[in-house]
Amino acid sequence: MEEVRRHLRIGVPLPCYFIGGSDDQRTRTILNKIVSITTEGGTGFDTHRFSGNVSADTVGDAAFEITFGGGRRCVVCEDLPFGSMGENEFKKFEQLVTEVSEMGGSTVLVFAFYSVETEPKKDSKAKSESKTGKKNRVEALKKLVDKCSGGVINCETPTTAELCTIIEKTCAK
C-alpha cells in the first residue's frame, strides 16, 4: 500500500489498480486522483469509463486504441459483475490485466467497486468459494492485479483515530 501511495504522490501511475471497500467517498477520491494523473486532468478523449455489465473485448478495445494526445490513456471499469460472468469472459479479463501490465505504462486499467463486497467474510468457512459454489472472482482479480505489479487499494471506513488525525491536520492549516 505504501508503494501505491508513493506512486500517486509523485504522479507516476501503476499499470493496473483494484480499488474497493466500504468507504465509497475514499474509493471515488482515489479513483479521481488516478484518472487525473494518468490523463493530465482526467478529461478528454483518453479517458474511458465503463460501468456495470461490459465485455472484456469492449474494455480491451479501449485499452489498446491509439491515444489522441500521444500520452497515456485511462480505462476505468466500475462495478463489473464478475460473479455472474461466464468463465471464458473472466479469463479474457485476466488476460487483459496481464497484457496491460506488460505494455509499459501507455494504458492504466482501473477496477473500482462501490457496491460489490471486496473483502471476504472473516467467519466464512470457504474463502475461495461463494454461496453458489463459484470461485470468488473479485478476490482472484485482486491477486492478479497485485501479481502484475499493480496497486490493490482497500478503502475502509476511517477509524476514530484516523478521523481525529484528519481533523487535526485540517485545523493546523
Task: State the predicted function of each range.
Residues 1-173:
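Conserved beta/loop motifs at nucleotide-recognition and modification sites
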